[in-house]
């Protein structure tokens, strides 16, 4: 069995961010799954500039050598090498973070024909409104969405001291998400 390069994107970059427990939970469980080679992307560390290329990434036709910025070129290559994507996102003002939207905007065709799943966290809505907007954005980028997302409402109270969710069924939901990412990628591989 071949392993899939699973890109996990943590969509927060602010100082004092608290969602690391959520991102670490996803990363840890993916790393324990023999089907995946994990590429964890912390957008604070990635530190992409604001997108300002002279042409759209979709006009580059998947040729990441057309990027003027070396950061954009490297990011496009990294995305191209992923077989699937899980986005871990907080919710800011009923939507995803600006740094996450910027990272998505930097790349065009390299996103295409990859499964994408969402794990969100926040207050009363648990990041669900951010995921709602991300669904519209990612379908436009050519990603194929896993139907079910995981939303952590009042996430600071949702994990124990070991970084595991208090509700055991949440781990099973994550496993089902992983299964669906693999299933969708296998369909793409057969079709391609």
What are these regions (language model features)?
Residues 25-33, 106, 110, 137-140:
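Alpha-helical structural signal in soluble globular domains
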Residues 89-90, 115:
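Short, proline-centered helix/strand-breaking motifs
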Residues 3-8, 115, 153-162:
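A short small-residue
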Residues 112-154, 168-172:
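Short, glycine-/small-residue-rich phosphate/pyrophosphate-handling segment
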Residues 97-113:
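Rossmann-fold NAD(P) dinucleotide-binding segment
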Residues 93-94, 125:
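Glycine-rich nucleotide phosphate-binding loop and flanking beta-alpha elements
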Residues 41-53, 109-110, 141-161:
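Mobile beta-alpha loop/short-helix "lid" or hinge segments that flank ligand
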Residues 1-89, 95-101, 164-183, 188-192:
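N-terminal beta1-alpha1-beta2 submodule of the flavodoxin-like/Rossmannoid cofactor-binding fold
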């Amino acid at each position: 069995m071949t392993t899939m390069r699973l890109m996990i994107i943590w969509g927060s970059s602010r100082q004092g961010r608290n969602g690391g427990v959520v991102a670490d939970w996803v990363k840890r469980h993916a790393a324990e799954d023999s089907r995946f080679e994990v590429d964890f992307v912390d957008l604070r560390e990635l530190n992409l500039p604001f997108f300002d290329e002279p042409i759209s990434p979709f006009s580059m036709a998947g040729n990441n050598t057309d990027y003027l910025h070396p950061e954009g070129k490297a990011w496009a290559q990294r995305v191209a090498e992923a077989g699937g994507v899980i986005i871990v996102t907080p919710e800011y003002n009923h939507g995803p973070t600006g740094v996450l939207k910027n990272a998505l905007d930097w790349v065009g065709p390299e996103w295409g024909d990859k499964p994408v799943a969402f794990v969100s966290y926040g207050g009363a809505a648990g990041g669900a409104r951010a995921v709602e907007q991300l669904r519209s954005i990612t379908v436009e980028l050519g990603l194929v969405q896993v139907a079910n997302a995981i939303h952590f409402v009042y996430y600071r109270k949702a994990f124990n001291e070991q970084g595991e969710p208090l509700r055991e069924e949440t781990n099973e939901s994550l496993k089902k998400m992983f299964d669906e990412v693999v299933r969708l990628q296998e369909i793409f591989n057969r079709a391609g």
